[in-house]
Amino acid sequence: MGTPEFPDLGKHCSVDYCKQIDFLPFTCDRCLQVYCLDHRSYMKHDCPKGNRGDVTVVICPLCAKGVRLNPDEDPNITWEKHVNTDCDPSNYEKAVKKKKCPVPRCRELLTFSNTIKCRDCSIDHCLKHRFGPDHSCSGPKKPESSFSFMGFLSTNTKEAPASSSSSSRWSSLFASAEASISRLGNDISQKLQFASGNDGNSEKTQERNGKQNCGKVTVDVCPKCSRGFRDPVDLLKHIDKDHRGTSKA
């Protein structure tokens, strides 16, 4: 096998009746045996593990689900496991029964190409009954309005209570509503008074600061005799007259 220069070059085919030496042999990924070019496929060398990669799925007639058969397991055992654990006969109608147009006396099957959802009622219909008048569209669902205090007052002023118990209940609700409104008004008035008081205090503080600033007087001191002068001109005259024009100590 091989050549004098490369003695390990090439291998014999693993098929008994072949044994051909191949310098570029093929190794089977299932049985891990070496084969020549002619016997490299699973069918050519009758690979015992060639069907491990095959996927076989059987549709269950009871639930319409796909059951995958394991190559290393008996199909009967796989089927029994599915029947005992996974099988749900109620799913058969959902999977097999095809959707139809909901309009009475219309037997049109709804598929991907002929199905249109109504914008108002959000229900699928066929092309023939895609418009609202054709399928007696009920229109969009009205959203439930949230409880509002004004609506509560308006409805209760128009409609009288039917019994004494209901009237007492409505009166208690009215009383609590009036109390909450009066409490809210008091809070608002207190906040307004507090804000106006703060504004007055701030104005008084500004006036006081202005008066203090106006009362301050700047005095220039003579560096020679430490005499103070309010007017800088008087300070210069004093230096020229009394200190002969010298301000340095």
From Swiss-Prot:
<keyword id="KW-0863">Zinc-finger</keyword>
<feature type="zinc finger region" description="AN1-type 1">
    <location>
        <begin position="7"/>
        <end position="55"/>
    </location>
</feature>
<feature type="zinc finger region" description="C2H2-type">
    <location>
        <begin position="220"/>
        <end position="243"/>
    </location>
</feature>
<feature type="compositionally biased region" description="Basic and acidic residues">
    <location>
        <begin position="201"/>
        <end position="210"/>
    </location>
</feature>
<dbReference type="InterPro" id="IPR000058">
    <property type="entry name" value="Znf_AN1"/>
</dbReference>
<dbReference type="Pfam" id="PF25403">
    <property type="entry name" value="zf-C2H2_ZFAND2"/>
</dbReference>
<keyword id="KW-0862">Zinc</keyword>
<comment type="function">
    <text>May be involved in environmental stress response.</text>
</comment>
<dbReference type="GO" id="GO:0008270">
    <property type="term" value="F:zinc ion binding"/>
</dbReference>
<feature type="binding site">
    <location>
        <position position="28"/>
    </location>
    <ligand>
        <name>Zn(2+) 2</name>
    </ligand>
</feature>
<dbReference type="GO" id="GO:0005737">
    <property type="term" value="C:cytoplasm"/>
</dbReference>
<feature type="binding site">
    <location>
        <position position="135"/>
    </location>
    <ligand>
        <name>Zn(2+) 4</name>
    </ligand>
</feature>
<feature type="binding site">
    <location>
        <position position="31"/>
    </location>
    <ligand>
        <name>Zn(2+) 2</name>
    </ligand>
</feature>
<feature type="binding site">
    <location>
        <position position="137"/>
    </location>
    <ligand>
        <name>Zn(2+) 4</name>
    </ligand>
</feature>
<dbReference type="GO" id="GO:0009651">
    <property type="term" value="P:response to salt stress"/>
</dbReference>
<feature type="binding site">
    <location>
        <position position="126"/>
    </location>
    <ligand>
        <name>Zn(2+) 3</name>
    </ligand>
</feature>
<feature type="binding site">
    <location>
        <position position="45"/>
    </location>
    <ligand>
        <name>Zn(2+) 2</name>
    </ligand>
</feature>
<dbReference type="GO" id="GO:0000976">
    <property type="term" value="F:transcription cis-regulatory region binding"/>
</dbReference>
<protein>
    <recommendedName>
        <fullName>Zinc finger AN1 and C2H2 domain-containing stress-associated protein 13</fullName>
    </recommendedName>
</protein>
<feature type="region of interest" description="Disordered">
    <location>
        <begin position="194"/>
        <end position="213"/>
    </location>
</feature>
<feature type="binding site">
    <location>
        <position position="129"/>
    </location>
    <ligand>
        <name>Zn(2+) 3</name>
    </ligand>
</feature>
<keyword id="KW-0677">Repeat</keyword>
<dbReference type="Pfam" id="PF01428">
    <property type="entry name" value="zf-AN1"/>
</dbReference>
<feature type="binding site">
    <location>
        <position position="106"/>
    </location>
    <ligand>
        <name>Zn(2+) 3</name>
    </ligand>
</feature>
<feature type="binding site">
    <location>
        <position position="39"/>
    </location>
    <ligand>
        <name>Zn(2+) 1</name>
    </ligand>
</feature>
<dbReference type="GO" id="GO:0009737">
    <property type="term" value="P:response to abscisic acid"/>
</dbReference>
<feature type="binding site">
    <location>
        <position position="121"/>
    </location>
    <ligand>
        <name>Zn(2+) 4</name>
    </ligand>
</feature>
<feature type="binding site">
    <location>
        <position position="13"/>
    </location>
    <ligand>
        <name>Zn(2+) 1</name>
    </ligand>
</feature>
<feature type="binding site">
    <location>
        <position position="101"/>
    </location>
    <ligand>
        <name>Zn(2+) 3</name>
    </ligand>
</feature>
<dbReference type="InterPro" id="IPR035896">
    <property type="entry name" value="AN1-like_Znf"/>
</dbReference>
<dbReference type="InterPro" id="IPR013087">
    <property type="entry name" value="Znf_C2H2_type"/>
</dbReference>
<feature type="binding site">
    <location>
        <position position="36"/>
    </location>
    <ligand>
        <name>Zn(2+) 1</name>
    </ligand>
</feature>
<feature type="zinc finger region" description="AN1-type 2">
    <location>
        <begin position="95"/>
        <end position="145"/>
    </location>
</feature>
<feature type="binding site">
    <location>
        <position position="118"/>
    </location>
    <ligand>
        <name>Zn(2+) 4</name>
    </ligand>
</feature>
<feature type="binding site">
    <location>
        <position position="47"/>
    </location>
    <ligand>
        <name>Zn(2+) 2</name>
    </ligand>
</feature>
<keyword id="KW-0479">Metal-binding</keyword>
<dbReference type="GO" id="GO:0005634">
    <property type="term" value="C:nucleus"/>
</dbReference>
<dbReference type="GO" id="GO:0097501">
    <property type="term" value="P:stress response to metal ion"/>
</dbReference>
<feature type="binding site">
    <location>
        <position position="18"/>
    </location>
    <ligand>
        <name>Zn(2+) 1</name>
    </ligand>
</feature>
